[in-house]
Amino acid sequence: MACPQLPPLLLLVLVVLLKAGVNYNTPFTDIVTSENSMETSPVSSLISSPFAHSTHSSGEPPKSYSSTMSLETDSITHLSPSSSGATPTIQPSPSSTDSRMIPSSPQPETITHPSSGSPSAELTPSSHSTLPSSESLTPHWSPTSHSPGTEPLTSTDQTLEPPGPAPGDTGPRELHRNPSVVVVVCLLVSLLLIGSVVMAVRFCHRNESKFENLDEVSMGSVNDRLSFAHHLQE
């Protein structure tokens, strides 16, 4: 009795195990699909953002990648059905991988590089163009500041200016006054000398006797004086 009952029990155990395996596989497939959807959403945002930026910068119309994204999600969620309870296998299609690899790396690089390099290319000629303008201005100013035409003007101005004395210097004025002072002093000295000579001559003539002048006196005047002297004596 026990021997013929063993196969049905084994069959029941196998059925239970198969059901448990199917129940175990279903949450695994749900987890895989949720993870794939989470992975595809940032990938789609990253792919759409550089292309949107490139379309704004270059002026080209935006391209839709909904078909490639749908192929990716379909290839990720595609599971091989198995009745024996084996683990599900993910079979991505080659078209989805090709479509994933083509727009991901080369296109953003080719689009972002000109957009980032364009301001530098526009700025560099402007900076180079401003430098020659400043350099071209400097030689125009340098000859005018050191031109030889201005030097004779300064020399003529210096020659036209009178050599007037400084406000604190009194040397030239004294030189102009000294000749007049010398002349006045010489005149005073000469007058004093002449006066002294005249006074000396007069003083010398006072000591002379009056008898030397008798020859010049008339005899009649002498007789009159003598008669008058006789009358006085009597």
Swiss-Prot record:
Low complexity compositional bias: what residue ranges? Answer: 122-140
Keyword Cytoplasm on entry? no
Key word NAD present in the record? no
Q: Which residues does the entry place in the Cytoplasmic compartment?
A: 202-234
| Keywords recorded for this protein, A-Z | Membrane, Signal, Transmembrane, Transmembrane helix
Q: Where is this region: Disordered?
A: 41-174
Chain segments annotated as transmembrane: 181-201
Q: What is its main location?
A: membrane
Q: Give any Gene Ontology cellular component.
A: membrane
* Ranges of Polar residues composition bias in the record: 41-121, 141-159
Q: What is this protein called?
A: Protein CIST1
The organism encoding this protein is Homo sapiens
